[in-house]
Amino acid sequence: EMEATMRRYNALRLYGIAAEFLDRAALARRVPDMNLGRDARWPILGALSQPRGGVARHDAVAWGFARGADNRGVDIIQNCEVTGFQRGADGRVTGVLTTRGPIASDKVGVAVAGHSGHVMGLAGMRLPIESHLLQAFVSEPVKPFLDVVVSTGALHFYISQTDKGEVLLGGGLDGYNSYGQRGTMPNIHEVTAAAIEMFPNISRLKWMRQWAGVMDMTMDGSPIIGKTPIPGLFFDGGWCYGGFKATPASGWCFAHTIATGEPHPLNAAFTLDRFGRSAVIDEKGAGPYPKAH
């Protein structure tokens, strides 16, 4: 893992991205509550730090985009479920059916993250996507002790502290297909054990709440942005668990694709038909296993 960390560090520096390598002494000064004992199950040798990296509150970002869209004349309809698509005689999509009535449109863009398979199924399409659950949970609030996000590949979890003092934890996928946003106890146990090993000072905290999000995992770990075989229907999804940070760029490329009818050069390779052409974009090299990405 240290070799992979150094390789990532060098790659970041080559691209002009601020990064620092922290040895044990520097890490102890930066994160004093971390267990750096030699007797740990996975002794910590060092860390990679991105000082300019940060955390954005998901809800606040959504509110900001919604307010900006509303100011520009976009009609945002809440609590309105899509139940199907209207189709013309030639098969072209001509609108959306919802619980509040039909909405006519010459072009329809689908961007529904974890429910991509379900919504596109309403149009008769089966996607090369699996839906998996990704859990997170928060503790009771405590005084500030952690002002960075810490993640580890060996223990396979991440930890941070919210502005309200809650300790936020998350780990890997639950490993089975589901739309139930509940998660499982084994995952909670594994992540909690790993967190206590790295930060023993949280061992007596109580969990306040837990939830799971539905992840749209593609067969190669890369997103799909572009046209579909159905005229007038466009799709943006398959972002696995990295979609939030890609929101501005993916939205811009998706808007360009819908407006012009052709993909932007930035998303031209991320087509739906790449899986049939053996043109997959498997950056991780994990193979055709959605849960491995």
Q: Predicted regions span which residues?
A:
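Dinucleotide-binding Rossmann-like beta1-alpha1 core, especially the glycine-rich loop
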Residues: 1-33, 156, 186, 194-196
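A general structural signal for well-ordered alpha-helical segments in protein cores
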Residues: 2-5, 24, 62, 116, ...
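C-terminal catalytic lobe of FAD-dependent flavoproteins
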Residues: 19, 154, 196-293
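Helix-loop-beta segment of a Rossmann-like dinucleotide-binding subdomain
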Residues: 8-9, 19-21, 28-72, 172-178, ...
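Helical element adjacent to the flavin cofactor pocket in flavoenzyme catalytic cores
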Residues: 47-107
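Short loop/edge segments at beta-strand edges and connector loops
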Residues: 23, 78-80, 209
